[in-house]
Amino acid sequence: MEITKTLGEFIVDHQNQYPTATGELSALFSSIRLAGKIVHREVNKAGLADIRGAAGGDNIQGEAQQKLDVYANEKFKAALSARGVVCGLASEEEDSFVAFDGQRSLQGKYVVLIDPLDGSSNIDVNVSVGTIFSIYRRISKTGGPVTLEDFLQPGRAQVAAGYIVYGSSTMLVYSTGDGVNGFTYDPSLGVFCLSHENMRCPPEGNIYSVNEGNYVHFPSGIKKYIKFCQEEDKPSGRPYTSRYIGSLVSDFHRNLIKGGIYLYPTSSTYPSGKLRLLYECNPMAFLAEQAGGKALAGVNQPVLDIVPSELHQRSPLIIGSSRMVDKACEFLSEK
């Protein structure tokens, strides 16, 4: 077996490049890594244990909470509160933010926003799911309680972001603002190993990912772009391939590696978009830009520039290969 760098070693090496680093962000990533391993274990035995299906409640979005949603949320919350470097958590599964009020946590510099199990409705049919996370420095004074304003920061202020995809293998992909790197979990060793160094999103691709079942509800520009993707034009490699899993992490991960575009636009049923700005759009937009791609909420509207006004704010999302995103926005800008 080829020896490669583990996630822990990679984090330490990266930390050593910054003489003023305190190690707190590294400790935060250790918490995410630990919770990811625990969720990986449960996802992999979902067909054998009584953790599939709905938990009997709704989250703040009005969506049925799946049992694994609740489980993953609790495990990430426990792991992130344990080390005292995070002062608060906002989760798609929580009505409001969660303040960690232990004495060490009050001194914590960071807040974390998380979708603990994206695409969990697919668990029952054995489709890949994932965790999405976003990290910010708190803007309130350390030593005091975390505030709502600590979470309502634009995506440009993210210190780090990433996701874990639980599929045929489990992979953690993250960025701290200097490129994107991916680590594949080796269950025999219990470690994440560097498998995708300096990931780059191709500027062009031949995959478009959109829920075409909602076509009738889409704005005319999106409809025109979908037709453009379906037209035959050999010089440009069209028609493109349609691939839509229904799990943002899985669709984004594929398009990041192979090149492609993911669209979840506004619609007559979701006039503000459906995806959550803070838990889904911002972290994925951060990764896309770090990998050379683009992420827009509309024409000339980068996702990362949006100033949020509420925790569970929704946003449209057009993300992926830069030239494909630009082309989609050409159609959106047509009168």
Swiss-Prot record:
Q: Where in the cell is it found?
A: Cytoplasm
Enzyme class of the recorded protein, top EC level: hydrolase
Where Mg(2+) 1 binds, per the record, is at E92, D115, L117
**Which residues bind Mg(2+) 2 per the record?**
D115, D118, E280
Name the EC number(s).
Answer: 3.1.3.11
Q: Is this entry keyworded Hydrolase?
A: yes
- One GO BP annotation here? fructose 1,6-bisphosphate metabolic process
Q: Name one GO cellular component term.
A: cytosol
Q: Can you tell which superkingdom this protein's organism belongs to?
A: Bacteria
Whether Manganese counts among this entry's keywords is: no
User: One GO molecular-function annotation for this sequence?
Assistant: magnesium ion binding
Q: Which PANTHER family match?
A: FRUCTOSE-1,6-BISPHOSPHATASE-RELATED, SEDOHEPTULOSE-1,7-BISPHOSPHATASE, CHLOROPLASTIC
Q: What is this protein called?
A: Fructose-1,6-bisphosphatase class 1
State the organism of origin: Teredinibacter turnerae (strain ATCC 39867 / T7901)
